[in-house]
Design a protein with these regions (language model features):
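Short acidic/glycine-rich loops and adjacent helix/strand connectors
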Residues: 1-309
Length: 309
């Protein structure tokens, strides 16, 4: 069986859109579009669209990536049995009506000239389910606690799941209002960094003292019973106001001062504290001794390295 997995903006590529920031949609921020081809569960090819169109973090529909994978597999799109799109369309204010098998098929037809009947082979996979499965299947574990966390996708910012012998049980969901990805990314502009520069914040953190702003950051979240947590800000604007009050504003070309390092350190400390709270509770509740992490927040190698220690 041939399976093609794809992720990216579910609309035809337009040559006049060179700015990744234009990919902002109600269901989320499409970025790092990609394609992957599997044959009978074995990886044949995988590549991000940015490697081919040379636009960093490109969120456009991965037409070039799809072509690359099919060429590596030596097949045409008509030979693919299942086309899995990594989002279902969300819900409520995060809903994107453009996400449907028919829409994905129409984009495939526009970009690759395939038969419109291909819609019958398109399946939509919930964003965080895709994250969770990718981590678990790649781990080789029979059973594991699986935690996903990022900005948000499909109207959810993360899942906590227990997996035993390929059977997933979702134990908790992280609402968008409590998104760790959005929380961690909120001070980027105040520190003079661009979008997708969370790695710079993480790299800056070791040079700072988290104690300087720890109390201020502790006012931004609450650790709750049963491994839950909540952000105290009622809106993203309120969160941004909180960072503005720290007096850490830096121009993109300005010098990095100790206050910027201390803010980064306090943010890193806060996210690690929240994640540790979640992991400790669900490790105890499930008895799992193995852990899988996925989603943008899991790319914080400073935090994950501490959890492994």
């Amino acid at each position: 069986m041939w399976v093609l997995g794809i992720q990216g903006e579910p609309r035809p590529v337009r040559s006049d859109r060179d700015d990744v920031l234009a990919d902002l949609r109600p269901s989320g921020w499409y970025h790092d579009a990609e394609a992957v081809l599997l044959q009978d569960g074995h990886l044949v090819a995988a590549i991000e669209e940015e490697r081919l169109n040379r636009q960093k973090h490109s969120g456009r529909f991965p037409a070039a990536a799809i072509r690359f994978c099919l060429e590596r597999g030596g097949i045409g799109l008509d030979a693919v049995d299942v086309i899995a799109f990594g989002e279902r369309g969300g819900q409520g204010p995060y809903q994107d009506p453009a996400i449907s098998p028919a829409q994905i098929a129409s984009v495939l037809q526009a970009e690759l000239g395939c038969d419109p009947g291909i819609a019958e082979r398109v399946t939509l996979v919930e964003h965080h389910v895709a994250h969770a499965v990718s981590a678990y299947v790649g781990s080789g574990f029979d059973e594991s606690l699986v935690v996903t966390a990022d900005g948000f996708g499909d109207g959810v910012a993360g899942y906590v799941s227990s997996v035993r012998n390929n059977a997933f049980t979702i134990l908790d969901r992280i609402e968008v209002a409590n998104s760790l990805g959005r929380f961690y990314g909120a001070p980027l502009a105040f520190l003079g960094f661009d979008a997708f520069s969370e790695y710079k914040l993480m790299g800056l953190a070791p040079y700072g003292d988290p104690a300087r702003f720890r109390a201020a950051f502790q006012q931004m979240y609450v650790l709750q019973a049963d491994g839950k947590f909540a952000m105290t800000a009622k809106s993203r604007a309120e969160t941004l106001d909180g960072f503005a009050r720290l007096g850490c504003q830096r121009q993109p070309d300005g010098p990095i001062e100790q206050i910027h390092c201390d803010v980064a350190a306090a943010m890193q400390d806060a996210v690690e504290t929240i994640l540790r709270h979640v992991l400790r509770h669900f490790r105890s509740a499930t008895g799992h001794r193995r852990l899988c992490l996925a989603g943008g927040t899991a790319q914080n190698c400073v935090a994950t390295g501490k959890f492994l220690a």
